[in-house]
Amino acid sequence: MSLHDSSGESVDARNLFTETAKLLMDGNIIAVKGIGGIHLASLATRDDVLEKFRRRKDRKNQPYALMSPDMDSIRSYALMNPVEEAHIQGWKRPVVLLRKRHRVISELVAPGLDTVGVMLPYTGIQTMLFKRFDEPALVMTSGNRRGLPMAITNEAAFSELGGLADYFLLHNREIINRSDDSVLRVIRGKPAFTRRSRGYVPDPINISISKGIGFAFGAELRNAAAIGTNGKVFMTQYLGDITSLEGVESEEKAIQAMRDLLNITCNPDVIACDLHPDYMTSQMAEVMSQEMDVPLVRSQHHHAHITSVMAENDIKNEEVLGIALDGAGYGEDGQIWGGEVLKSTYSGYKRVGQLEYVPMPGGDLCAYYPYRMLISSLTKQLSDDEIRDITGNHIDSALPHGPQERDIILNHARRKDILQTSSSGRFLDSISALIGLSYNRTYEGEPAMLLEALASRGTPDSVNFSPEIVNKGGKYILNTSNVLKYLIDKDNRYKKEDVAAFGQ
C-alpha cells in the first residue's frame, strides 16, 4: 500500500491509515482504491468540505453515498427496519437507501431529499481506516470524471482524479473487472435495485422461457448488458451511461468477461438491443450482429421493461397488462414514450393506454429545465398571453434566458412537427417546476426525487381532483395538461406537500 499527494509523490508516514484519517479530519478529499474501483472519500459532517467536494466533482446536488463503521453509527442519522438492517449487514454489502433521521450528517450529502444511501465497510482497507477516527460516516462515492467510468488503475487515479482528490491511498493489486457499489431500497419488504453490481453479479436470474444463447446490450443510460443461456440470465455489473468511447469499451469488456466466465465460445443465437437507432449500444449490437451473422432483435424500451418483470416472476407466455413509467424511451411512432399501458406477451404488445402527448421544445433541454415542460404542457390548455401572465413572476429564475426563452418555447410548442412525449418523468418534472421545487436539473431524476421527498409529508387526497381519461380509438389517454391547469387555477389553495403527494 502507498499514500500519495496530488502531485503523485509518496507521503512518508509511519502508519498509512492513521495519516489518511488525519488528512480526512483536516478536510481533505482522498481517493481510496478498493476491490471494484476507486472511491473518493471525505467527511460527511462538514458543510465546507462537501461544498469543496461538489465544486470539484461538478455535482451540484446529486446525492452521495455514505459508509459508516457500524450499525450504531448508521442509527445516529438514519431510520431502519429489520429488512433494511439485514441487507446492510449482509455479505453483499450494498448501498441501502434509508430515511434520514437527525441532522448528524451535513444536509449537503443529499440536498432536499428525505433519504440517504448507506453501506458498511467491505474491504480491509476501509475497516482499518474507520478504526483510526471517530466519525459516524464518510462520503464514499465513485471516483470518476463526469461521463467516464470509475477509475480502476493507479495510473487512472492520478490522470483522471487529479484535481478532484488531494491525496491517494492505493494498493498494488490489479482490479480486473470494474464494479460499482450496488444500490437498493426496500419496498414492501423486498429489495428493488437502483443499481445491481458489486456483490450481486454474476448471480443469475432464473427464467423458464430462455432458449439458446442471447446477448442483450441494454439501453444507453444507466446501462447493464446481459447474456441469457440455459434458462438463466447473467447480467453484467452496472456500467453507467454508454455515451463515450470509454463507456463503449467498458461494455465490450464486460460482455467478453461474462462470456469467458460462462465459457461461451460460440456465437449467440440472437442479439438484442433497444429500438432507438442512435443509441451507441444499438450501434454496438448492429456491428456484432453483422460480424457474427446473427439475427438482431430491436426491443421497444417499455415493452422490454414489462417483459423483464414477466420473466423475473416466471410468467409464461400469457397476455398481461403492464404499466411502464420512466423518463424516456423511443416509441414505435418515433415519439418519446414514458407513461405506457401495454397489453403484452413476450413476442409483442398493444399500446392500450398512455399519458397525454405533450410537445418537447428543445428536445432533451426539457429534461434539464423542467419549466420548459410546464410551459409546453400549458399550451394545450391556455393561450400564449395567459401563459405569459401565469409565468411572469418566476420566468427569470426558471429559465436561463427568461421571457425571451419562454416566447421561443411557446412558438415551438405549437408547431405540428415538434417532438412529442408521453413521459411520466416529464410530467413529474412539470409539477416540480409548478410548485417552485426544481427549475434546473443537475442530475438525472432530480425534480422527481425532490417531489417524492416533499410528497412523503403530504396527503394526496387533500387535492380534490380526478384526472380526465379519454378513450381515443380504443386507447385510453390520461390528460396531464388538464391536471396542471387545475393546480394553477387553485393557486395557493393546496399545500405544496399535498400537491407533490397528489402528483406522485
Regions flagged by a language model, labelled:
Residues 15, 48, 69, 124, ...:
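Generic recognition of stable, solvent-exposed alpha-helical segments in well-folded globular domains
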Residues 219-257, 379-504:
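A contiguous, well-structured pocket-lining segment that forms one wall/lid of small-molecule binding clefts
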